[in-house]
Protein backbone atom coordinates (compact mmCIF):
# COMPACT_ATOMS: atom_id res chain seq x y z
CA UNK A 1 0.00 0.00 0.00
CA UNK A 2 1.26 3.49 -0.86
CA UNK A 3 1.78 5.74 2.18
CA UNK A 4 -0.59 8.30 0.60
CA UNK A 5 -3.69 6.99 -1.14
CA UNK A 6 -6.38 9.36 -2.37
CA UNK A 7 -9.47 7.74 -3.85
CA UNK A 8 -12.53 9.39 -5.38
CA UNK A 9 -11.74 12.78 -3.83
CA UNK A 10 -14.47 15.40 -4.07
CA UNK A 11 -14.53 18.99 -2.85
CA UNK A 12 -16.88 21.94 -3.03
CA UNK A 13 -16.64 25.70 -2.63
CA UNK A 14 -20.15 26.51 -1.55
CA UNK A 15 -22.51 25.07 -4.14
CA UNK A 16 -19.74 24.75 -6.74
CA UNK A 17 -18.06 21.37 -7.06
CA UNK A 18 -14.30 21.76 -7.53
CA UNK A 19 -13.08 18.14 -7.55
CA UNK A 20 -14.73 15.13 -9.16
CA UNK A 21 -13.55 11.70 -7.97
CA UNK A 22 -9.82 12.48 -8.11
CA UNK A 23 -7.52 9.56 -7.27
CA UNK A 24 -3.75 9.49 -6.83
CA UNK A 25 -1.07 7.70 -4.82
CA UNK A 26 2.40 8.62 -3.59
CA UNK A 27 4.72 5.79 -2.55
CA UNK A 28 7.62 6.12 -0.13
CA UNK A 29 10.56 7.68 -1.94
CA UNK A 30 8.44 8.52 -4.99
CA UNK A 31 8.09 11.95 -6.58
CA UNK A 32 4.66 12.55 -8.12
CA UNK A 33 3.91 15.62 -10.26
CA UNK A 34 0.36 16.97 -9.99
CA UNK A 35 -0.18 18.93 -13.19
CA UNK A 36 -2.84 20.96 -14.96
CA UNK A 37 -3.65 24.43 -16.20
CA UNK A 38 -4.44 27.19 -13.72
CA UNK A 39 -7.68 26.72 -11.83
CA UNK A 40 -8.03 23.01 -12.59
CA UNK A 41 -8.04 21.77 -8.99
CA UNK A 42 -4.40 21.14 -8.10
CA UNK A 43 -4.24 23.37 -5.02
CA UNK A 44 -7.74 22.27 -4.00
CA UNK A 45 -6.49 18.68 -4.04
CA UNK A 46 -3.58 19.64 -1.78
CA UNK A 47 -5.84 21.57 0.60
CA UNK A 48 -8.16 18.57 0.78
CA UNK A 49 -5.31 16.17 1.56
CA UNK A 50 -4.01 18.48 4.29
CA UNK A 51 -7.44 18.97 5.89
CA UNK A 52 -7.55 22.66 5.07
CA UNK A 53 -10.98 22.31 3.45
CA UNK A 54 -13.70 19.64 3.82
CA UNK A 55 -13.56 16.84 1.27
CA UNK A 56 -15.34 13.65 0.32
CA UNK A 57 -13.83 10.37 -0.76
CA UNK A 58 -11.03 8.45 0.92
CA UNK A 59 -7.68 9.93 2.00
CA UNK A 60 -5.34 7.56 3.83
CA UNK A 61 -1.74 8.04 4.90
CA UNK A 62 0.20 5.13 6.37
CA UNK A 63 -3.15 3.38 6.58
CA UNK A 64 -4.73 6.12 8.71
CA UNK A 65 -7.84 8.05 7.65
CA UNK A 66 -6.73 11.66 7.25
CA UNK A 67 -10.32 12.84 7.14
CA UNK A 68 -10.58 11.87 10.82
CA UNK A 69 -7.87 14.40 11.70
CA UNK A 70 -8.78 17.80 13.13
CA UNK A 71 -8.61 20.53 10.51
CA UNK A 72 -5.14 21.91 9.74
CA UNK A 73 -3.39 19.06 11.61
CA UNK A 74 -1.72 17.29 8.68
CA UNK A 75 1.72 17.73 10.29
CA UNK A 76 0.60 15.46 13.11
CA UNK A 77 0.11 12.69 10.55
CA UNK A 78 3.56 13.20 9.01
CA UNK A 79 2.77 15.51 6.10
CA UNK A 80 4.87 18.60 5.51
CA UNK A 81 3.28 21.28 3.33
CA UNK A 82 4.80 24.24 1.54
CA UNK A 83 1.61 25.99 0.39
CA UNK A 84 1.29 28.23 -2.62
CA UNK A 85 2.83 31.57 -1.70
CA UNK A 86 5.70 31.84 0.76
CA UNK A 87 4.63 31.10 4.32
CA UNK A 88 6.53 32.10 7.43
CA UNK A 89 5.98 34.26 10.49
CA UNK A 90 7.40 37.69 9.52
CA UNK A 91 7.42 38.89 13.12
CA UNK A 92 9.70 36.02 14.18
CA UNK A 93 13.38 35.47 13.46
CA UNK A 94 14.50 32.79 11.05
CA UNK A 95 15.53 30.57 13.96
CA UNK A 96 12.21 31.13 15.74
CA UNK A 97 10.36 30.19 12.55
CA UNK A 98 12.24 26.90 12.41
CA UNK A 99 11.78 26.16 16.10
CA UNK A 100 8.05 26.87 15.92
CA UNK A 101 7.65 24.10 13.32
CA UNK A 102 9.90 21.54 14.99
CA UNK A 103 8.75 18.00 15.71
CA UNK A 104 10.97 15.10 16.86
CA UNK A 105 13.04 13.40 14.18
CA UNK A 106 16.20 13.64 12.06
CA UNK A 107 15.41 17.08 10.64
CA UNK A 108 16.53 19.87 12.95
CA UNK A 109 18.14 23.28 12.63
CA UNK A 110 21.57 21.97 11.61
CA UNK A 111 20.28 19.64 8.90
CA UNK A 112 18.01 22.32 7.45
CA UNK A 113 20.91 24.79 7.36
CA UNK A 114 23.03 22.17 5.61
CA UNK A 115 20.36 22.15 2.90
CA UNK A 116 20.00 25.96 2.88
CA UNK A 117 23.40 27.37 3.96
CA UNK A 118 22.36 30.85 2.86
CA UNK A 119 20.07 31.06 5.89
CA UNK A 120 22.90 30.39 8.33
CA UNK A 121 23.93 34.02 8.66
CA UNK A 122 20.31 35.18 8.85
CA UNK A 123 19.17 33.08 11.81
CA UNK A 124 18.68 35.97 14.21
CA UNK A 125 17.17 38.32 11.66
CA UNK A 126 13.46 38.87 11.22
CA UNK A 127 11.93 36.70 8.51
CA UNK A 128 10.39 39.89 7.12
CA UNK A 129 13.88 41.04 6.04
CA UNK A 130 14.45 37.99 3.83
CA UNK A 131 14.19 38.10 0.06
CA UNK A 132 11.37 36.20 -1.62
CA UNK A 133 13.70 33.33 -2.44
CA UNK A 134 15.04 33.17 1.10
CA UNK A 135 11.51 33.15 2.48
CA UNK A 136 10.67 30.21 0.23
CA UNK A 137 13.76 28.38 1.44
CA UNK A 138 12.64 29.06 5.00
CA UNK A 139 9.17 27.76 4.17
CA UNK A 140 10.66 24.50 2.88
CA UNK A 141 12.90 24.34 5.94
CA UNK A 142 9.90 24.78 8.21
CA UNK A 143 8.09 21.94 6.44
CA UNK A 144 11.11 19.68 6.89
CA UNK A 145 11.35 20.63 10.59
CA UNK A 146 8.00 18.88 11.07
CA UNK A 147 9.92 15.69 10.14
CA UNK A 148 7.41 14.56 7.54
CA UNK A 149 7.23 11.29 5.65
CA UNK A 150 5.46 13.09 2.81
CA UNK A 151 6.42 16.55 1.53
CA UNK A 152 3.94 18.53 -0.56
CA UNK A 153 5.27 21.49 -2.55
CA UNK A 154 2.62 23.71 -4.12
CA UNK A 155 4.24 26.00 -6.71
CA UNK A 156 7.46 26.17 -4.68
CA UNK A 157 9.40 27.88 -7.48
CA UNK A 158 6.66 30.24 -8.68
CA UNK A 159 7.76 33.85 -9.14
CA UNK A 160 11.38 33.29 -8.14
CA UNK A 161 14.51 34.46 -9.93
CA UNK A 162 16.06 31.79 -12.19
CA UNK A 163 19.07 31.13 -9.95
CA UNK A 164 16.90 30.73 -6.85
CA UNK A 165 14.46 28.57 -8.77
CA UNK A 166 17.29 26.27 -9.85
CA UNK A 167 18.63 26.14 -6.29
CA UNK A 168 15.25 24.91 -5.06
CA UNK A 169 15.08 22.28 -7.81
CA UNK A 170 18.54 21.14 -6.71
CA UNK A 171 17.26 20.81 -3.15
CA UNK A 172 14.28 18.75 -4.31
CA UNK A 173 16.63 16.48 -6.26
CA UNK A 174 18.80 16.08 -3.18
CA UNK A 175 15.79 15.20 -1.04
CA UNK A 176 14.78 12.57 -3.57
CA UNK A 177 18.26 11.08 -3.65
CA UNK A 178 19.15 11.21 0.04
CA UNK A 179 15.86 10.67 1.90
CA UNK A 180 12.94 8.28 1.79
CA UNK A 181 10.45 11.09 1.53
CA UNK A 182 7.47 10.80 -0.75
CA UNK A 183 7.09 14.11 -2.58
CA UNK A 184 3.99 15.55 -4.25
CA UNK A 185 4.90 18.45 -6.55
CA UNK A 186 2.78 21.10 -8.19
CA UNK A 187 4.75 23.19 -10.65
CA UNK A 188 4.50 24.60 -14.16
CA UNK A 189 8.12 23.81 -15.08
CA UNK A 190 7.64 20.81 -17.35
CA UNK A 191 11.36 20.42 -18.04
CA UNK A 192 12.27 20.21 -14.35
CA UNK A 193 9.27 18.04 -13.46
CA UNK A 194 10.19 15.62 -16.24
CA UNK A 195 13.74 15.38 -14.88
CA UNK A 196 12.82 14.68 -11.27
CA UNK A 197 9.32 13.14 -11.04
CA UNK A 198 8.63 9.42 -11.30
CA UNK A 199 4.95 9.67 -12.19
CA UNK A 200 2.43 12.37 -13.02
CA UNK A 201 -1.29 13.04 -12.66
CA UNK A 202 -3.04 15.67 -14.79
CA UNK A 203 -6.22 17.44 -13.70
CA UNK A 204 -8.67 19.25 -15.96
CA UNK A 205 -11.68 21.06 -14.48
CA UNK A 206 -11.33 19.12 -11.25
CA UNK A 207 -11.18 15.72 -12.92
CA UNK A 208 -8.22 13.39 -13.32
CA UNK A 209 -7.76 13.09 -17.08
CA UNK A 210 -4.37 11.37 -17.25
CA UNK A 211 -1.96 9.44 -15.07
CA UNK A 212 1.21 7.52 -15.82
CA UNK A 213 4.98 7.46 -15.64
CA UNK A 214 7.09 10.42 -16.68
CA UNK A 215 8.32 8.35 -19.64
CA UNK A 216 4.72 8.15 -20.81
CA UNK A 217 4.24 11.93 -20.55
CA UNK A 218 4.66 12.49 -24.28
CA UNK A 219 4.35 15.78 -26.19
CA UNK A 220 0.99 14.55 -27.43
CA UNK A 221 -0.23 14.18 -23.83
CA UNK A 222 1.08 17.56 -22.70
CA UNK A 223 -0.32 19.30 -25.77
CA UNK A 224 -3.74 17.74 -25.30
CA UNK A 225 -4.10 18.33 -21.58
CA UNK A 226 -1.71 21.20 -20.77
CA UNK A 227 -1.61 23.15 -24.01
CA UNK A 228 2.18 22.86 -24.16
Task: Go through the PLM ranges and name each one.
Residues 2-228:
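Glycine-rich phosphate-binding loops of nucleotide-dependent enzymes
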Amino acid sequence: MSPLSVQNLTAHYGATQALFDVSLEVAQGEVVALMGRNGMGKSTTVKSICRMIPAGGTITFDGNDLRALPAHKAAQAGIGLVPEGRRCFPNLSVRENLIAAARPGPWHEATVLDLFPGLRDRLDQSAATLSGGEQQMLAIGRALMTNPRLLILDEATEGLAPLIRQAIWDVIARLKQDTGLGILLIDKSLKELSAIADTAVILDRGTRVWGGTIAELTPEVTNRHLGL
